[in-house]
Amino acid sequence: MDRVTLTEAYLEELESAGLSSEELLGNLPQNKILNSDKPNGMGKWLARPVFLGGEELTRLAGDLDNLLTALDSLPEKLFGGDFAAFARAVGLTGPQVEAVMQNRGERMTRQSRADLVCDGAGFKLLELNIGSAIGGVDNVDVCRELLEVPVLAGFAERHGLTFVDSLREQVHNILTESGFCAQDAPVVALTEWPSAFSDELPYMTQLCERWGELGLDATPCHLGQLEVREGRVWLDGRAVDIIVRTFLIRDVVGPDAARLTAPVFEAARRGEVKVFTPLDTSAYASKAALALLSEEGNRHLFASGVLESLDRILPWTRRVRREEVTLENGERVDLVEYATAHADDLVLKPTSLSGGKGVVLGWADDLTPEAWRAHVLAALDSPYVVQRRVRPVQETVPVPGGGVDRFRPVWGIITGVNGFIGGSVRAIPSAAGDVVVNVANGAHVGALLHEAPAPVV
């Protein structure tokens, strides 16, 4: 079966069961870790999961693996191994490049969350979040809570639907990419920036407790609580083996930031501690890096199988510059003129912001042609990309008060050392209109259940 047939079959069962959306959620609204970082301790949840068939999952996982491999190769293939040049090309500022060069890994991490939409023909990538600070890894709890409801549990059993324990896989990512195994019992410091620590502490505490259940000895802290002395990094009198970084590139370029970062990054370079994940993820996660993969002039760098994956999963994406670019049909056009004339089919995105910040939808009802042109011209002076619009198919979901509603989803597919390691979905009611799908605009969070991946032939 596939996404569509599984969804149709489950909606038929729900209609016969006659359960309310509240009953379908079970105890999900009371889950501690899932709601610890939500406003008022309560999130908005979809009353049913989304589904993927085995063949769909196999192809999607393969496409993401090819994309990540291609992304990892860009500094070498395009810049001769000059990582600073790569970082500048994808829009990092001078101070950001300097910070990244102080804390790099031997290779790009495989821990990522790909935010995708399905347009009916397949999945298209909107952005790629890379590194230790990605959200959505706690999706395993959403799956477990929903599967406590008998109607979904029975449906999942009959159709062979399952999920991946993303938290367990995250622990595996941390250990493997830091050079440890579980038997080493490394001491982990889950480390935030001081100014954000108090707000994030409830969630960090819950996460460390869950990691502890999986055998990982982790403690929440902020960077100012770490001490570098005697050839080690210390937290509360314990030598730390791994720093799991949740602070961001924007934090480390602020005033007086070097006082906090320099001792720790120097200790990492000396091999006294591992950082999961290093700051180089900020360059790989830039949307301009996706533009480099999309640009016609770089296609010769990749094998045919990789190109097939990129063509399937990556919408037409270009850095906003005064230059000629190639369209999907091979036509050469002036980028600024083309973008200005095709607002309804394009979106502007800052290269390094997340959560929909700074995104301009060319088709927005309240955006005039003059305003769109002004946004395009302004983007020439900042690191921006322009991307082809993707028109997603909507999902039917039971809602409070009875009946169903249509939701516009963004799928968050998580990858790690073992490839696909789970996923979730954020979805916004269609009545909200064409707005960015995020919590600020009323997005609900849902689970992903899937068939076992089909064998690769």
Q: Model-predicted segments: where are they?
A:
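Preference for protein termini
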Residues: 1-457
